[in-house]
């Protein structure tokens, strides 16, 4: 088995290669990752809902040594799972080498997660914060109105810069 230090650096080089061929190649790769991830989490997410998602990511937190906090709370319309990553080990490892990070490295997380959230019927707002800091925030909502309120807040924080925010639902009906 390849050590995670090598894996994330290899991933990074694949991302750079594909982006160099054209952004659509990188997007297609993220969708391929998403399809493969379904075997690991689709059933748990669809049957366990937000608690199943929380349980899945708590295992990942331990396995990957993530500096993150997650909690489920009440939104205005339904339950919401919030995630705050204050130390992403994956991006940290990619930055800690002389090859340089793919400028879009962080996009792989929403790239695989958003399609799965759509399949299980949850609304996802992913705030990348900055592409060169190993930090991000995510909110997963049962109800679209909670997600729209979160999206509005995140877009306001980024002064309308949509490049650092990813979501899987229409902003308006």
Report each predicted region and the residues it spans:
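N-terminal accessory segment detector
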Residues: 1-107, 118, 123-173
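ATP phosphate-binding glycine-rich loop and adjacent ATP-lid/helix-beta elements
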Residues: 108-109, 113
């Amino acid at each position: 088995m390849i050590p995670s230090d090598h894996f994330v650096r290899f991933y990074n080089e694949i991302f750079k290669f594909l982006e160099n061929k054209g952004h659509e190649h990188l997007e297609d790769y993220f969708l391929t990752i998403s399809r493969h991830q379904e075997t690991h989490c689709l059933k748990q997410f669809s049957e366990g809902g937000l608690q199943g998602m929380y349980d899945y990511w708590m295992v990942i937190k331990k396995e990957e040594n993530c500096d993150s906090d997650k909690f489920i709370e009440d939104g205005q319309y339904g339950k919401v799972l919030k995630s705050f990553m204050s130390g992403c080990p994956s991006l940290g490892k990619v930055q800690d080498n002389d090859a340089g990070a793919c400028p879009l490295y962080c996009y792989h997380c929403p790239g695989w997660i958003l399609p799965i959230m759509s399949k299980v019927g949850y609304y996802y707002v992913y705030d990348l914060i900055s592409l060169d800091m190993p930090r991000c925030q995510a909110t997963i909502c049962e109800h679209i109105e909670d997600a729209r309120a979160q999206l509005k807040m995140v877009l306001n924080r980024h002064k309308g810069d949509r490049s650092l925010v990813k979501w899987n639902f229409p902003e308006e009906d």
